[in-house]
C-alpha cells in the first residue's frame, strides 16, 4: 500500500533526522520544521518525512549548503519552485540515520512562498479534524486510482489536491490574521 496508517514513529523519525542535521549545521543560524503529511497526527500518509530548513539571511544559505554536503547530501536545485532548494542523499553513507529514514529535505528563506504554503497547510490540518479527514480520503482515492503507483499518485495529487490545499491555506491565513488582530 502506498498510503500507510498514521504512526507516531514519523514524529520520532523527524527528531532523529533533525538531530543528525543539527550536527552538520552546528554554528549556523537556521530553524528546522517537520512539514507534510507525516507531521500531522492521525493523518495516514506515504511514509516520507518532509523537512524544511529555514534561514533568515541570504548569507546563511551557502553555509547550510556546505554543511549538508559534508553530511552526505547533494544540492539538487529548486526543481522549478522558487525559493525552495532541494537536497538529496548522495549514496555515501556517513550516518545510518540519514540513509535509513526516507525523507525529503528542502531549504527555504523565511520569505519563501513554498515555506508559507508548507507551514499554513500543516497548521490548518493539525487544527481541523474535518480537513484532515477530507484530505486523507482524497489521498486514499488517488492511491487507488493510481494503482498504488508512486509516480502516477504524485501526478494525480498535483492535479487534484491543489485546490483543496489552496482553500485551507486561505482559511489558515484568515485565522492567523484574526488572532494577530485580536491581540492588538
Q: What is the predicted role of each segment?
A:
Residues 111-184:
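Catalytic cores of NTP-dependent nucleotidyl/adenyl transfer enzymes across multiple folds
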Residues 2-8, 52-53, 121-125:
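Short histidine-centered catalytic/ligand-binding loop motif
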Residues 1-4, 44-47, 145:
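A short, surface-exposed helix-loop junction/capping segment
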Residues 1-33, 162, 173:
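Helical scaffold of the NTase/Pol beta-like nucleotidyltransferase catalytic core
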